[in-house]
UniProtKB/Swiss-Prot annotation:
GO terms for molecular function: 23S rRNA (guanine(2445)-N(2))-methyltransferase activity; RNA binding; rRNA (guanine-N7-)-methyltransferase activity. Its EC number is 2.1.1.173, 2.1.1.264. It is found in: Cytoplasm. This is Ribosomal RNA large subunit methyltransferase K/L. The keyword Ribonucleoprotein does not apply. The lineage of its organism: Bacteria, Pseudomonadati, Pseudomonadota, Gammaproteobacteria, Enterobacterales. Belongs to the methyltransferase superfamily. RlmKL family. It is an enzyme of class 2 (transferase). InterPro entries: 23SrRNA_methyltr_KL (IPR017244), DNA_methylase_N6_adenine_CS (IPR002052), RlmKL-like_Mtase (IPR000241), RlmKL-like_Mtase_CS (IPR053943), RlmL_1st (IPR054170), SAM-dep_methyl-trfase (IPR019614), SAM-dependent_MTases_sf (IPR029063), THUMP_dom (IPR004114). It comes from Klebsiella pneumoniae (strain 342). One of its GO terms (cellular component) is cytoplasm. Residues 43-154 form the THUMP domain. Keywords: Cytoplasm, Methyltransferase, RNA-binding, rRNA processing, S-adenosyl-L-methionine, Transferase.
Length: 701
């Protein structure tokens, strides 16, 4: 009998144990990452040929304590390597694990290689050569703390490499994991199996091989026992011949079909090639089809199983499309596949909830570094029609707001407005419309809120938003932000450079919904910008802390004699220039200046009739000369502004400081007075958030 070890993906150990026992293995003991078992030579070869779940089959050779590199060398050399190698056999060493003495896996592999080679030279035998690419023998050494476990890897390459796949689509799963997903899906061989996002066909091919009794190792051309002196070629040939016979008989006897579809024509063609190489191509119907086009291939029966490993994104920007995809899949399952079973494997439990189905069973497994879950559902025969909306109370509020604001915005001549602003506390997001695009901004939840529940609620919000607004998922942009404390934090998010043109009254403006936390247009200042346009005719206009210059555009369109736009950011000044140019506002009358605004104010000697200033609540930028606090420093600011203000001129002063208190006495000492116009500058879409900004008109007393 041989003591053997089969490794597998985390989470599949018990399933592998059952499989090995079915092959005849005895004394099976589950450990993390695999199963120890006993078996004779025939069982050894059968496990290599027939295990659909094992990653590798290893023959343990010994172990040694490692307190130094010499201990490792001597421990390896104690194994009778000369009795193990066929003459001329090549080998490679795979070393994993570190300890205080062996701190580099390459160094560990080198010491093992030296010990093996020296075993031959000491006996005056030809030394074996190393072949890292395709060795005849593969030695596996795992160093766990102070113990090195030394094994002969009889698999050679990983057993997931069946020999039928020449390439994959994006984010593939290994074949042994695919086999486990099939085994856990509840699918019964002989009944239909459908994969609506099949990619390169791995799930369906593994299922078809299982159903037709085709051994997973039948198409492999290289093994790890070719140079093993104890290899019994006669028994191996018997095992292989039996597998070939069973595959022929299984294929001839199988009567059901498999169905696979994917939106990518090239991936489907690859799936067809893979299936043909696996010997089961005639059983699988592959089609180029989007999930939205999915239909039941057997509407009159029999019932079958839908199995899928849909995409699950790790980037925030991909989530709206994935949420919509899962919601769509759930709706199609309910409407067209009543009586069937569904099994979905995913790294995102939150996305699975978008199916709006109740799971009967669930399993956990690792897909590489990802913690994944597989959920099985039974689709009731009576399921059908329109499913209930996720987050129904949120959806109802959004629907109500849409009805109210859509007509109003059309009448106002604006394309950008707020549709929802945390109206319901449990749905803590802001939703803004920019033409036919929508931006959902999630306010970062408090640390006391369960992260999983918060993410789940966000997914519900996105699914409901897409449904209520009837928008394409790629027209929804998702952002997460702290509650805004001012406009000093223009955080860079991406480098897409995608700008869209929007209309605000008579102004055309560029917005960018993806590259920054903000979009280039502060919607709450819409009415203030219109007022500036109405006040600007024939005047010299100054825009300080100008951001993307939208106020300058309104002033220019309102007939300003000149506009001067000042900001410290080159990025935003270039954006402002694009906005001005889009509206035909070019030439010497429309200046843009990159400068520290506070420093520029102190040094400038120019005069202006109308000044708009919207400073940050607080800033200590390295490029500014000193820290700025709008509450503390606004009178100092007004001192500089007054010097630039012509007789009869007006300053429009706005900021986002909640609870801001104007120092009227300080203003009076400067010969100025302030009229608060905050409520006049708030439009309907910001009526619920009356403290989003405060705004003042400041003139000579």
């Amino acid at each position: 009998m041989n003591s053997l070890f089969a490794s597998t993906a985390r989470g599949l150990e018990e399933l592998l144990k059952t499989e090995l026992e079915g092959l005849g293995a005895t004394d099976c003991q589950v450990v993390q990452g695999g199963v120890h078992f006993q078996g004779d030579t025939r069982l050894l070869y059968q496990s290599l040929m027939w295990s659909r779940l094992a990653s590798r089959i290893m023959l343990p050779l010994g172990e040694c304590r490692v307190y130094s590199d010499l201990d490792l060398y001597l421990g390896v050399q104690a194994i009778p390597w000369t009795e193990m190698f066929n003459p001329g056999a090549t080998f490679a060493v795979h070393f994993s694990g570190l300890n205080d003495e062996i701190r580099n896996s390459q160094y560990g592999a080198l010491k093992v290689k030296d010990a093996i080679v020296d075993s031959f030279t000491r006996k005056n035998l030809p030394r074996p050569n190393v072949d890292r690419e395709s060795p005849d023998l593969r030695i596996n050494v795992w160093l766990n703390k102070e113990t090195a476990h030394i094994s002969l890897d009889l698999s050679g390459e990983g057993l997931h490499l069946r020999g039928y796949r020449d390439g994959t689509g994006m984010a593939p799963i290994k074949e042994n994991l695919a086999a486990a997903i099939v085994m856990r899906s509840g699918w019964v061989p002989g009944t239909p199996l459908l994969d609506p996002m099949c990619g390169s066909g791995t799930l369906l091919i593994e299922a078809a091989m299982l159903a037709t009794d085709r051994a997973p190792g039948l198409h492999r051309g290289h093994w790890g026992f070719g140079g093993w002196a104890q290899h019994d070629d006669a028994i191996w040939k018997e095992v292989k011949a039996e597998a070939q016979t069973r595959a022929r008989q299984g294929l001839a006897a199988y009567g059901s079909r498999f169905y696979g579809s994917d939106v990518d024509e090239r991936v489907i063609e690859r799936a067809r090639r893979n299936a043909r190489r696996a010997g089961i191509g005639e059983l699988i119907d592959f089609a180029v089809k989007d999930v939205a086009q999915l239909n039941n291939p057997l509407p009159k029966g029999p019932y079958g199983t839908v199995i899928s490993n849909p995409p699950y994104g790790e980037r925030l920007e991909s989530e709206p499309a994935l949420i919509a995809l899962h919601s769509l899949l759930g709706r199609i399952m309910k409407s067209q596949f009543g009586g069937w079973n569904l099994s979905v494997f995913s790294a995102s439990p939150e996305l699975l909830s978008c199916l709006q189905l109740r799971a009967d069973k669930q399993f956990k497994a690792k897909n590489g570094p990802l913690d994944c879950i597989q959920k099985n559902y039974h689709l009731a025969e009576s399921e059908g029609g329109k499913p209930a909306m996720l987050a129904e109370d949120f959806a109802n509020r959004l629907r109500k707001n849409l009805k109210k604001f859509e007509k109003w915005a059309r009448q106002e001549g604006i394309e950008c407005y707020r549709l929802y602003d945390a109206d319901l506390p449990e749905y803590n997001v802001a939703i803004d419309r920019y033409g036919d695009w929508v931006v959902v901004q999630e306010y970062a939840p408090p640390k006391t809120v369960d992260a999983h529940k918060a993410r789940q609620r966000l997914f519900d919000i996105i699914a409901a938003t897409i449904a209520v607004l009837e928008i394409a998922p790629n027209k929804l942009v998702l952002k997460t932000r702290e509650r805004q404390k001012g406009k000093n934090q223009y955080q860079k998010m991406a480098e897409k450079g995608d700008f869209i043109e929007v209309q605000e009254y008579n102004a055309r403006l560029w917005v960018n919904l993806t590259d920054y936390l903000d979009t280039g247009l502060f919607l709450d200042h819409r009415i203030a910008r219109r007022m500036l346009g109405q006040m600007s005719k024939g005047k010299d206009f100054l825009n300080l802390f100008s951001y993307t210059g939208s106020a300058s555009v309104h002033a220019g369109l309102g007939g300003a004699r000149s506009t001067t736009t000042v900001d410290m950011s080159r990025t935003y000044l270039e954006w402002a220039e694009r906005n001005l140019r889009l509206n035909g506002l070019t030439g010497r009358a429309h200046r843009l200046m990159q400068a520290d605004v506070l420093g520029w104010l102190r040094e400038s000697t120019e005069q202006f009739d109308l000044i708009f200033i919207d400073p940050p609540t607080f800033s200590n930028s390295k490029r500014m000369e000193d820290a700025f606090d709008v509450q503390r420093d606004h009178i100092r600011l007004m001192t500089d502004l007054k010097r630039l203000l012509r007789k009869g001129g007006t300053i429009m002063f706005s900021n986002n400081k909640r609870g801001f208190r104007m120092d009227h006495d300080g203003l009076a000492a400067l010969g100025l007075k302030a009229q608060e116009i905050s409520q006049k500058t708030l439009s309907q879409d910001f009526a619920r958030n009356r403290q989003i900004h405060n705004c003042w008109l400041i003139t000579a007393a």
